Amino acid sequence: MQLTELSIQSQNPFVRDYINGKKEIEPFFDYGLSNESWSVRLDDLSSRTYDRDALADYLLDYHRKFQSATMNETIERLRDPKSVVVVGGQQAGLLTGPLYTIHKIVSILLLAKQKEQELNVPVIPVFWVAGEDHDLEEINHVYISDGGKVKKHKLPQSHWKKSQAAKTALDAEKAEKWLDGIFASFEETEYTNDLLGHLRRCLRQSLSFTDFFEFLVADMFEQDGLILLNSGDPGIRNLEARFFRQLLDKNDELTDSVKRQQELMKQLGYTPIIEGAAQHANIFYERDGERFLIEKENGAFFIKELHLQWSEAELCDLICQNPEAFSNNVVTRPLMQEYLLPTLAFIAGPGEINYWGELKGAFQVMGYKMPPVVPRLQVTFLERHIEKKLDERGIELRESIEKGARAKKEQYFQDKVPSGFTDSVKQAKEKIENIHSAVRAEALEIDGSLGPLLEKNAGFIQDQLQFLEKTVIRRIEEKENYILRDFDKIQTSIKPLDAPQERIWNIVYYLNKYGPDFLEKYKDLPYSFQNMHQVVKL
């Protein structure tokens, strides 16, 4: 493996200006990306207290299923009052989901190791598994290449309820068939049987989406001491209950703070992405396995679908009695994270940078400062045969990452279609139509009822010319097929579905092709947090 870096600007203006350190962004964050921010943040954390022992005890109990001494040792370090964490999170995607999940975990591990050396305090890597998330349509599939086409390979399920990923059961039989379908799309290698066997074993010991995700991630990263915090686990709610009540107490202030921040964002020409904050209490309530967002109006909290209504005091009592029924939304999840963890830094994807910028006031309402928000590594894997095709087809690497190869393919093909031929067909259509129009006019003078028949005849003649043109173009496509497929292969590998590679493809393809040490080699590359696009040549 070889690492190279490219300067590729984000398409999101807010993210781009944040990374470039524009002054307009300062009102949205408490810390910048400069080196001075780290010692300031460390000092700020030293003035706060955390229930470290309760958190460590809970995590040790939760991590028993992984049977990892390394993970347990890392958890014990949380008891040290000087310890801090680097945290990032993602939904519990099948087979770990899109590549950006792996890139985010590597970013967490890398920054934690780097800051521990620089700051001389224990810095612990934590991955926040969004097990409380109920948007299963986002995690119930992976993409595969089928006959050169990118296709969504969805796990069959009779009915997708609005249940948390941590509580959504996996049908083992259906999931194994689904897994076999993925491997059927792969080229069989010397690693295939062992990898498939390992994934099946992880699947069989998993009861839910979150289980399957965590067993895979733990296996990949447990030697790095990565800690997993499943936000959908009922056991974490006892630690969160007190803060849920604080969120209710300051609910109106939270709502107002988000609205003000969003208005400021709009005034500066940026686009907020959090929706409906004014009507929501920003807390979910679970009943019969489904999540419902609590709304508020005139001091009352309610869920229309369930015909439920509470006063603030009644809802606080319910949280005390049954904390497992409550969970966070996009606004309160970052605040809960700040409450539970001594967070040195939050590793964020582009979308998270945008919506965290809407929450600075919310952090202040709860008495916190927003932690430094560090952009995760953005990575493209460049396979050797794809790199060769880029060179052969005259496509720059940067261009392929930013735009793909579709436009180059179209240009190449158009250059192969003789301009004289298309012009000749166009002229023939016009001349024949002019002649036929005159003939139609004479025929109509003889018999006015012939109109429909004459129009049909004219259309038939034009269709024959169209057929001729398409046939010639198809022959050119067949002749140039080998080269045209090269453009398609570049597009599929680097810019599938016109999206960044990291948003579509899954790590299992690379593990199957390059073997179990692929991940170790990838983790050990000399990355730097200089906001450059990382290209890993395979």
UniProtKB/Swiss-Prot annotation:
Residues 454-482 form a coiled coil. InterPro entries: Bacillithiol_biosynth_BshC, CC_BshC, Rossmann-like_BshC. The keyword Metal-binding does not apply. It is an enzyme of class 6 (ligase). Belongs to the BshC family. It comes from the Bacteria. This is Putative cysteine ligase BshC. It holds the Pfam family Rossmann-like_BshC. Its EC number is 6.-.-.-. It comes from Bacillus licheniformis (strain ATCC 14580 / DSM 13 / JCM 2505 / CCUG 7422 / NBRC 12200 / NCIMB 9375 / NCTC 10341 / NRRL NRS-1264 / Gibson 46). The keyword Coiled coil applies. Involved in bacillithiol (BSH) biosynthesis. May catalyze the last step of the pathway, the addition of cysteine to glucosamine malate (GlcN-Mal) to generate BSH. GO terms for molecular function: ligase activity. Keywords: Coiled coil, Ligase.
